[in-house]
């Protein structure tokens, strides 16, 4: 199997995954220092440098106004409107909107891994600082704003660019319809999305980077994160109908190296990859509902010196439901299904796949209940199935498949406590903290429940308990 084919399979995680950092693995303490020193100086010199509390200070609203659970990726209707309108609401007052975030925790798996998941770590029972991120988040001009993230990975010990979403937005009346329209420049298909049902900002919002994860997932589910640059035009009509269309292009080895992603992570995207999104949303009383579709068509060259291509056509459908009561109860549910058609002419000709035509299907569902934005519990279900292919999915300890099947199925159970980051919290909006315990269980892993890898490992051996903290300033 070629390195490029491996990269696409490994980087395309549906669930679980870590959404904030997907850079290539490096080992550099110096890069951490180079990142932290100017960031700390900026934070200390600016009274407005806060969590993406920088958004909270700009708008004059608490983080909980935009986020369903005090703070984090999950957005309320207000949060979606703030993003839709280009991150410009409020008065930034001429200050620089900086923020920072730290995530870490303890990872325990049911059975030790054969090899350590990263340098400087053990095969089990690992304590880690997973991410230290710096942000620019807020208004640039009256009609443009940005969300820019740079992350140091505690596992890789390397700094890289992370999520990027730069927007320009305007509003207008066309006949009897009100329209918000705009442009987004971003570096990951679905990172610009307004909903938490799509891969870019979907559950789980935090996972261990040191635990085993299934080998297969559609390329739209993180396969191109921080490896491409794209632009899309969008419009929201009457706050109901959302339409978006755009395209992505791969970055050169030179730029990937400069940005910290690494030239060895290049998926070798051939030409432009079109992306589309459509969604219908509505509020009714204390409830909110949306249903939509999105997709991506892309061509890759596993061997950049060859004209032969692999094609990936992803088509997805998603839905979101939210309910909030005056008594402090909140409920949210997200559903997502992706079908990927794979035409692997280049990989098949090179002997890296057993078939020239494969497919993958993924289904995810998560339901969250929160009380007073303090106690939060979530259950998530995930299922991946697809074509058996001994070329793509070969036997190997822990990460391999004896049957050549990508099928994986399981659940995520999450319990969180949020002492800071709410409407009435101490030092709002500067101080934000959530702590939690997350358990990931596997019923199938890479094709089977028992001896899935050909070396005696069971799917349940990868069950993971992750105790974490998530701090934003």
Show the residue positions of the predicted features:
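Sequence/structural signature of outer-membrane beta-barrel proteins
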Residues: 105-111, 151-157, 173, 188-192, ...
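N-terminal secretory signal peptides that target proteins for export/translocation
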Residues: 1-28
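Outer-membrane beta-barrel "beta-signal"
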Residues: 62, 413-419, 459-473
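The canonical Cys-X-X-Cys-His
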Residues: 61-70
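Outer membrane beta-barrel
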Residues: 74-76, 98-109, 121-253, 270-286, ...
């Amino acid at each position: 199997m070629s390195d490029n084919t491996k990269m696409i399979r490994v980087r395309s995680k549906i669930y679980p995954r870590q959404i904030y950092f997907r850079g290539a693995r490096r080992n550099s303490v110096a890069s951490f220092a180079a990142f932290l020193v100017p960031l700390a100086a900026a934070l200390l010199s600016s009274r407005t440098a806060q969590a993406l509390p920088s958004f909270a200070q700009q708008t004059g609203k608490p983080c909980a106004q935009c986020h369903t659970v005090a703070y984090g990726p999950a957005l309320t209707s207000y949060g979606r409107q703030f993003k839709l309108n280009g991150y410009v609401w409020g008065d930034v007052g001429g200050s620089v909107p900086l923020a920072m975030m730290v995530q870490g925790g303890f990872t325990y798996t049911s059975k030790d891994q054969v090899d350590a998941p990263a340098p400087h770590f053990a095969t089990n029972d690992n304590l880690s600082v997973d991410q230290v991120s710096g942000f620019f988040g807020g208004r640039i001009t009256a009609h443009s704003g940005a969300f820019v993230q740079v992350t140091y990975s505690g596992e890789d010990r390397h700094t890289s660019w992370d999520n990027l979403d730069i927007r320009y937005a305007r509003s207008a009346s066309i006949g009897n319809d009100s329209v918000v329209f705009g442009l987004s420049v971003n570096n990951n298909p679905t990172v610009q999305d307004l909903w938490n049902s799509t891969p870019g900002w979907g559950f789980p919002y935090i996972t261990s980077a040191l635990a085993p994860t299934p080998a297969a997932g559609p390329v739209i589910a993180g396969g191109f994160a921080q490896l491409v640059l794209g632009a899309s035009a969008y419009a929201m009509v009457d706050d109901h109908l959302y339409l978006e269309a755009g395209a992505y292009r791969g970055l050169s080895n030179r730029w990937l190296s400069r940005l910290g992603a690494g030239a060895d992570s290049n998926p070798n995207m051939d030409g432009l990859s079109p992306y589309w999104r459509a969604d219908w949303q509505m509020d009714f009383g204390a409830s909110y509902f949306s249903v939509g579709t999105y997709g991506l068509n892309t061509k890759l060259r596993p061997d950049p010196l060859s004209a032969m291509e692999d094609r990936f056509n992803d088509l997805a459908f998603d839905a979101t439901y939210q309910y909030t009561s005056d008594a402090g109860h909140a409920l949210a549910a997200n559903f997502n299904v992706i079908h990927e058609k794979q035409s692997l002419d280049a990989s098949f000709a090179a002997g890296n796949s057993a078939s020239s035509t494969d497919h993958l299907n993924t289904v995810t569902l998560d339901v969250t209940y929160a009380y007073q934005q303090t106690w939060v519990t979530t259950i998530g279900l995930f299922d991946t199935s697809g074509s058996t292919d001994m070329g793509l999915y070969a036997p190997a300890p822990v990460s391999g498949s004896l049957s050549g099947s990508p099928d994986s199925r399981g659940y995520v159970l999450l319990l969180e406590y949020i002492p800071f980051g709410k409407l009435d919290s101490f030092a709002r909006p500067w101080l934000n903290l959530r702590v939690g315990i997350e358990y990931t269980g596997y019923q199938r892993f890479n094709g089977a429940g028992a001896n899935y890898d050909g070396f005696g490992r069971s799917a349940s051996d990868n069950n993971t308990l992750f105790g974490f903290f998530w701090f934003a300033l």
